[in-house]
């Protein structure tokens, strides 16, 4: 039922996550559920899946990466965080403590001087350094839009317009009511939270 959107160019990454909580299938229980976990100054993770797994895995990941930065004096890069998340889900999958979560990881790598967008699903399948990614059923409606309209040199305004187009398509075609989305952008200057997309 949930929907995550990620769009990346060399200069920025835009992430959006729905704010809905569903119960008993498609019944909207809450419209203010935050699915974002900040992993660093220029690094964040959007997480969907089973509600308990999302809360536990998101918090566990956030605290472990914060501990790493305290112990070592620097934050991990976005690609390193992506590998850590993928390995954590893979190890959990082979134990009794597996997490049923799908994540999008976005950030800006100062060392490589470019934005990063990656995803990991609940079976630990990872995709790194992608131009656009979706998690959730609504993504099936949006890949055609991105295939047709995505450009590597899009401005932030063009990227946001394209993201809004995808969210609008999901709103129009998906059976469940998703009332709003949290939107963030990360670039060389840092992390910014933008106005929510509301319907």
Swiss-Prot record:
CC per GO annotation: cytosol; nucleus; proteasome core complex, beta-subunit complex
PROSITE patterns in the cross-refs: PROTEASOME_BETA_2
Record keyword Nucleus present: yes
Example GO BP: proteasome-mediated ubiquitin-dependent protein catabolic process
Places the protein is found: Cytoplasm; Nucleus
Alphabetic keyword roster: Cytoplasm, Nucleus, Proteasome
Superkingdom to which the source organism belongs: Eukaryota
Entry-linked Pfam families: Proteasome (PF00227)
Assembly mode: The 26S proteasome consists of a 20S proteasome core and two 19S regulatory subunits. The 20S proteasome core is composed of 28 subunits that are arranged in four stacked rings, resulting in a barrel-shaped structure. The two end rings are each formed by seven alpha subunits, and the two central rings are each formed by seven beta subunits. The catalytic chamber with the active sites is on the inside of the barrel.
Entry similarity comment: Belongs to the peptidase T1B family.
Role this protein plays: Non-catalytic component of the proteasome, a multicatalytic proteinase complex which is characterized by its ability to cleave peptides with Arg, Phe, Tyr, Leu, and Glu adjacent to the leaving group at neutral or slightly basic pH. The proteasome has an ATP-dependent proteolytic activity.
Name of this chain's protein: Proteasome subunit beta type-2
Species per Swiss-Prot/TrEMBL record: Caenorhabditis elegans
Gene symbol of the encoding locus: pbs-4
């Amino acid at each position: 039922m949930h929907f995550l959107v990620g769009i990346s160019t060399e200069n920025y990454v835009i992430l959006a996550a729905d704010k809905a909580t569903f119960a008993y299938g498609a019944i909207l229980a809450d419209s203010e559920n935050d699915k974002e976990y900040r992993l660093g100054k220029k690094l964040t993770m959007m997480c969907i899946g089973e509600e308990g797994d999302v809360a536990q895995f998101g918090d566990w990941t956030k605290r472990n990466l914060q501990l790493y930065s305290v112990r070592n004096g620097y934050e991990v890069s976005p690609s390193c965080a992506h590998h850590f998340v993928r390995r954590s889900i893979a190890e959990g999958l082979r134990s009794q403590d597996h997490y049923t979560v799908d994540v999008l990881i976005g950030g800006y790598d100062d060392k490589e001087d470019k934005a990063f967008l990656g995803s990991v699903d609940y079976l630990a399948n990872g995709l790194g350094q992608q131009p656009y990614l979706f998690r959730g059923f609504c993504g099936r409606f949006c890949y055609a839009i991105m295939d047709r309209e995505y450009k590597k040199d899009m401005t932030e305004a063009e990227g946001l317009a394209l993201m809004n187009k995808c969210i609008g398509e999901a709103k129009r075609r998906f059976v469940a009511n998703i009332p709003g989305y949290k939107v963030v952008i990360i670039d060389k200057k840092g992390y910014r939270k933008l106005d929510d997309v509301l319907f």
